Amino acid sequence: MSDSPKPQLPPSPQGDHCLVHQQELEAVTEKWFEIMVRVQPHHTDYGGVVWHGTYLTWLETARVECLRSIGVDFADLVKLGCDLPVVSLALRYHRAIRLGQTAVIKVQMQEIQKVRLEWQNQIVCLETGEPCVTGKITLVAIDPAKGKIMRRLPPVVQEHLLKLRQ
């Protein structure tokens, strides 16, 4: 075993005074996090339409960046022994986004129930303002070493997730 210290997430500005340590985390959030992507040739099929699998990559990027914006670096989270795989995915495709257009990817952690994180998703075409994809993605915290669902999120992660409610 290595003597090097285990990685840690930075402490939440709320500090150790947060009551999350003693209770299960359950929350509902209303804030949307957004990133923009200009559609490149590698995002599309031969017809210049965004390939459906690309949307999943964009949504994951937006979730990871949303977590990073509140102090949860995904790589550090995994090093701490907590991974967040997708366990449920439901997307509805409304219309295509095409090569050269800009996609606005919006994610919102809608609900937190213990170790289950439910995300609402929207992808909108910037040029038209029309929704192209909507859906819901559910993540569950697991211990990757054991391959089992965790009983609760690490307290420091819970504290950071509460920032999404503010």
Swiss-Prot record:
> Which InterPro entries does the entry link to?
4-hydroxybenzoyl-CoA_TE (IPR050563), HB-CoA_thioesterase_AS (IPR008272), HotDog_dom_sf (IPR029069), YbgC/YbaW (IPR006684)
What Enzyme Commission number(s) apply to this enzyme?
3.1.-.-
GO terms for MF? fatty acyl-CoA hydrolase activity
Entry keyword annotation includes Hydrolase: yes
State the active site.
45
- Keywords attached to this entry: Hydrolase
Q: Which domain of life is it from?
A: Bacteria
- Fetch the NCBIfam families from UniProt: YbgC/FadM family acyl-CoA thioesterase
**The family this protein is said to belong to:** Belongs to the 4-hydroxybenzoyl-CoA thioesterase family.
Task: From the Swiss-Prot or TrEMBL record, give the protein name.
Answer: Putative esterase sll0410
Q: Native species of this protein?
A: Synechocystis sp. (strain ATCC 27184 / PCC 6803 / Kazusa)
